[in-house]
Amino acid sequence: MTIKKYKTALSGMFPEEIQSFCGLKEKFRAQQIFHWIASGVNSFDEMTNLSFDMRSKLKNDFSLFSTKIKEALKDKDGTIKLAVELYDGSVIETVLLTDKAKRKTACVSCQAGCPMKCAFCKTGQIGFLRNLSASEIVEQFLHLEREAGSLDNIVFMGMGEPMLNLPEIDKAINILAHPKGRNLSKRRITISTSGLCKGIYEMADKGPEVRLAVSLTTADETLRSELMPITKTNSLDELKQAIKYFNSKSNKRVTLELALMKGLNTDKKAAQEVIEFAKGLECFINLIPWNPVEGLNFKTPSETEVRTFETYLKKAGLNISTRQKRGQSIGGACGQLGSTAARSNRF
């Protein structure tokens, strides 16, 4: 794979940027390079419609990629987790999820670490280094496609808070959706936030084609403040108004994600609070039984506990689903990312 020890990589550029950066006279040459990158080549040598001399010059002067796979793990359920080393030696993690219908979803990271400090999340416990560049985001998707073939969806639910890195995420999305490249439909892309209202408004005002998910977890203000410190500066009332605004601007329903923890947010009172929060919203509820994280004292709810909670919500007319456990044995399930990064990075 063509990698050099600096952060500027062609994978994070549009065709016109490649043309300018590489000093190419012909626009179509840049488009050819852009298409090759999206096709998953590992080096300039594989770009067979470029002359040998051009490939040699490009190889000597430029870098296709700025990241490489440090570690690859595969769960028996088909989940793949990659630890990806960045140009500066930092490590992030990205996951491939395959559902029962064989749809493949890339769960990508947008930051090295995470500053949000959610109490139930591994990534929130390991600290924060920096935002990722568009190339570092795009390359996660490309690495996963090389491992597993063509992917169907992208969710920004890996390491980091997407609303703190929207410019680079937006660029990465537009690169992957570019008609002369990967041409991925934006409707197959979801951005998940812990509840940073400013970012939700910013997304809404762009007239988003992508989907929004919000990690709600609980609609009890006091409990949510303890579990998710973001609540202290972005209250539940403010969050609900931001979601309503997104509904109105996008004509899309928002997914509310609830990480369920045994004896903490799964009783009838917790359900009633979620039902009340959801009133007036175009939303879908995704229940996520908590995945064990070493060093954290939360517990996974029993199946009976989850089913009872489901019933409360369904009786209120809410549309819900419960996420299947995938990737637990390799630390690749929701809330578990960061084990390799914690060993490798200096937070």
Curated annotation (Swiss-Prot):
Reaction proceeds by a ping-pong mechanism involving intermediate methylation of a conserved cysteine residue. One of its GO terms (cellular component) is cytoplasm. GO terms for biological process: rRNA base methylation; tRNA methylation. Gene3D superfamilies: 1.10.150.530, Aldolase class I. The keyword NAD does not apply. Pfam families: Radical_SAM (PF04055), RlmN_N (PF21016). Residues 100-323 form the Radical SAM core domain. [4Fe-4S] cluster binds at residues 114, 118, 121. Binds 1 [4Fe-4S] cluster. The cluster is coordinated with 3 cysteines and an exchangeable S-adenosyl-L-methionine. This is Probable dual-specificity RNA methyltransferase RlmN. Its cofactor is [4Fe-4S] cluster. GO terms for molecular function: 4 iron, 4 sulfur cluster binding; metal ion binding; rRNA (adenine(2503)-C2-)-methyltransferase activity; rRNA binding; tRNA (adenine(37)-C2)-methyltransferase activity; tRNA binding.
